[in-house]
Curated annotation (Swiss-Prot):
It is found in: Membrane. InterPro entries: Cyt_P450 (IPR001128), Cyt_P450_CS (IPR017972), Cyt_P450_E_grp-I (IPR002401), Cyt_P450_sf (IPR036396). Its EC number is 1.14.-.-. This is Probable cytochrome P450 514A1.
Length: 575
C-alpha cells in the first residue's frame, strides 16, 4: 500500500512541477515560435491530446486547413512547425534554406539507432552510411541489371497464374509483399529464402510498420515511456524488430566467415570478377567499409535493417495501391497496354529495364500520379532547424522540429485544383519523373536515398504485369485505395482477377482466316475473330462501322509493328 501511495505521490509532484515550469518559464524556442499561428495549448501536454493517436497525418492535415501552410504545434515538451505546400517545402529543403533544414530531429523512440543507422544519424557519418547505399543504386547500375526484378516478377506471376487463362489472386497486397521481400533480400543480402521464412518476414515487417505509424507519446513526453513499451510489447513490435535484426546478423556472420577464408574480391582482377564486384549484395559493401574503418560494426545491422524495412513496406504498399487504382479505372490499364504494345517491337518486354522508361510517357504519368495520390509516407521523419530562419513571413527558432505535411501537399485543392482527389494521370502528361510539387521521396539532402531504386522497380513491375495481364475486380465493390495509417500507408486487403492477354503470336490464326478478305459490314465480320481483336487492347476503341460515307477516304491505324489498314467503305486486314 505504501509503495502505491509513493508512486502516485511521485507522479503527482512531477506533473505539478511540469505545469509550473510550463506556466512560468518560457524557453527561447517557445518565445520565438509563439508568433506562428496554431491551436491553443494546455500545460504539459500542449496539443498532444488534440491529436488522433491512430491517424496522426489526418490530425496534422486538419490543422493545416485551419491555420495555413506554416503553423505551430507543441506536443508535450517538443516545439514543432508544420510545413505544407510545394513552394514552402521546396524553398526550405531544396533551395534557399537547404542547409538549415538538413539535420534529422531524433525522436525519443529513435535513440536506440542514434548515430548508427541511416535514418537517425546526422553529420558526416550519415552521409558515409547513405553514400554506401546510393553508390549501389545509380541509374547506370540499375539499367545494367543490378536488380533481378524481372526474374522475381515473372516468377511470381508464373506461380500464381500457372497456365490458367484467368486466376483469382486472394489478398493481392500480401502477394505483392512476398514479391517485395524476395526482391529486397536478394538486393541487400544476396539470398533467396524459402517460402516459410519469407512469410514470417512479411508478417514481422507488416507488424512493425502498422504499429510504428501510431503516435508514440514518449517521443514528446519521455516519462510516458513505460506506457509506450507496454503498448509496443502488446503489438509485438519489439520482438518483430529483434527477429529481423537477428536474421540479418546470421547472414552477416556468414559473410565474415567468407572474408576470413578468402580474399578473392581483392585479389581477382579478371573481367568476370569485375562483374561480380558490381553485383555483390549491399551488406557486403557495408562490411567492406567496416573493414576499412569507415563505419561501426553495428551500423551494418542497423543500416541494412533500415533498407529492408523501408524498401519492402513502402514499395509493396505503393504497388498494391496502384493496382487498386488501375482496377477501379480500367481505361488507364488499356492506355498503358496500348503504349506497351507500341514499344514491344520484338515481343521482348519481359526483359525491359529502367533504361527504357523514357519511351513510355503515359506510364511515367501514371507513376507520377500514383506518387502524388498515394504518398507512401504522408508525414516523413522530422527534421530540425540548425539556426533561426524566416519562412513565409514567420520566424522559426533554431532547434525546432520540422514536419512536412505530404498528405496536404499532394492532395490539397489549394495546390492541385478542384480535381485534386481524383486519380488523373493526365495532369502529368509528357512530364518526366521527379516532378516539381511531388515529395514522395522526401526533399533535400535527407530525402529517401532509394528513390531511383523504387522508380526502377515500379516501372519494371508495371510494364511486365500489364503486358501479360488485364486486372479485373471480381466484385462490384470498388477497391479501397485510401490506405490505412502506418509508418507507410498500408493497403487494405483485396482480391483481384488476373486475366492473361492473348499472346501476339496468336495473330497467325486471325491472319489465316482474314488476310486479304473484305467485309462490307460488321455483321460479316466473324464473331470468333472479333473476340481476338478485342483481347489485343481494342476493348471499345475498335469498331466495325457501317454506313460511313465512302468519300471519307482511308485512315491508317497503328497496330503493333504490323500494318493495319482501315477502309471506310470496307475492311481489309493486312498483317
Amino acid at each position: 500500500m505504501n509503495t502505491i501511495f509513493t508512486i502516485i505521490l511521485t507522479i503527482t509532484i512531477l506533473v505539478l512541477s511540469l505545469i509550473l515550469k510550463d506556466l512560468l518559464f518560457e524557453g527561447r524556442i517557445k518565445k520565438i515560435n509563439k508568433l506562428i499561428p496554431g491551436p491553443s495549448t494546455i500545460p504539459v501536454f500542449g496539443n498532444l491530446l488534440q491529436i488522433n493517436a491512430k491517424d496522426f497525418p489526418k490530425s496534422v492535415n486538419d490543422f493545416y486547413e485551419r491555420y495555413g501552410k506554416v503553423f505551430r504545434l507543441r506536443l508535450g515538451s517538443v516545439e514543432i512547425v508544420v510545413l505544407t505546400g510545394p513552394e514552402v517545402i521546396d524553398e526550405c529543403f531544396n533551395k534557399k534554406h537547404r542547409e538549415i533544414f538538413k539535420e534529422r530531429y531524433i525522436k525519443f523512440s529513435r535513440f536506440f539507432g542514434k548515430d548508427y543507422n541511416i535514418i537517425s544519424s546526422n553529420g558526416d557519418y550519415h552521409y558515409v552510411l547513405r553514400g554506401i547505399l546510393t553508390s549501389e543504386i545509380t541509374t547506370r547500375k540499375l539499367n545494367n541489371g543490378r536488380l533481378e526484378s524481372n526474374k522475381f516478377i515473372l516468377e511470381m506471376f508464373s506461380n500464381l497464374c500457372k497456365d490458367n487463362k484467368e486466376t483469382l489472386v486472394k489478398n493481392t497486397p500480401n502477394q505483392i509483399r512476398i514479391l517485395a521481400v524476395k526482391l529486397i533480400l536478394n538486393f541487400t543480402l544476396g539470398i533467396e529464402e524459402n517460402d516459410e521464412t519469407i512469410l514470417i518476414i512479411v508478417e514481422k515487417i507488416k507488424c512493425i510498420f502498422e504499429a510504428a505509424g501510431l503516435l508514440i507519446y514518449s517521443d514528446y513526453l519521455p516519462f510516458l515511456f513505460p506506457l509506450d513499451i507496454k503498448s509496443m510489447s502488446k503489438n509485438d513490435i519489439i520482438s518483430s524488430y529483434f527477429f529481423l535484426k537477428d536474421f540479418i546478423g546470421i547472414k552477416l556472420d556468414a559473410i565474415k566467415i567468407k572474408y576470413e577464408k578468402e580474399n578473392e574480391l581483392k585479389n581477382e582482377t579478371t573481367d568476370e570478377t569485375s562483374s561480380k564486384l558490381n553485383n555483390i549484395p549491399i551488406i557486403e559493401n557495408y562490411y567492406k567499409n567496416y573493414l576499412d574503418g569507415s563505419i561501426h560494426y553495428d551500423s551494418i545491422l542497423f543500416s541494412i535493417s533500415d533498407i529492408i524495412f523501408a524498401a519492402v513496406d513502402s514499395t509493396s504498399n505503393g504497388f498494391s495501391l496502384l493496382i487498386g487504382q488501375l482496377i477501379n479505372k480500367p481505361e488507364i490499364q488499356d492506355k498503358i497496354y496500348e503504349e506497351i504494345m507500341r514499344n514491344d517491337e520484338n515481343n521482348n518486354t519481359n526483359n525491359i529495364s529502367f533504361a527504357d522508361h523514357t519511351k513510355y510517357p503515359y506510364i511515367i504519368s501514371v507513376m507520377n500520379e500514383s506518387y502524388r495520390y498515394n504518398s507512401s509516407v504522408p508525414i516523413t521523419e522530422p527534421n530540425k532547424t540548425t539556426e533561426d530562419v524566416e519562412v513565409n513571413g514567420y520566424k522559426i527558432a533554431k532547434g525546432t522540429m520540422i514536419i512536412k505535411n505530404l498528405r496536404g501537399t499532394h492532395l490539397s485543392k489549394e495546390f492541385w485544383g478542384e480535381d485534386a482527389l481524383e486519380f488523373k494521370p493526365e495532369r502529368f502528361k509528357n512530364q518526366p519523373l521527379y516532378q516539381k510539387g511531388l515529395f514522395h521521396f522526401g526533399a533535400g539532402p535527407r530525402g529517401c536515398p532509394g528513390g531511383r531504386f523504387t522508380e526502377s522497380l515500379t516501372f519494371t513491375f508495371l510494364v511486365i504485369m500489364l503486358k501479360n495481364f488485364k486486372i479485373v475486380n471480381p466484385t462490384d465493390i470498388p477497391i479501397d485505395v485510401e490506405g490505412e495509417v502506418g509508418l507507410a500507408m498500408q493497403c487494405k486487403p483485396f482480391d483481384a482477377l488476373f486475366i492473361k492477354h492473348t499472346n501476339r503470336n496468336d495473330f497467325s490464326k486471325i491472319n489465316k482466316g482474314l488476310n486479304q478478305q473484305c467485309f462490307t459490314s460488321s455483321s460479316q465480320f466473324p464473331t470468333c475473330y472479333q473476340t481476338e481483336f478485342f483481347e489485343f487492347g481494342f476493348n471499345g476503341n475498335f469498331q466495325l462501322n457501317d454506313g460511313i460515307d465512302c468519300s471519307s477516304g482511308v485512315q491508317q491505324l497503328s497496330f503493333f509493328e504490323k500494318g493495319f489498314v482501315f477502309r471506310v467503305d470496307h475492311f481489309l486486314f493486312e498483317f
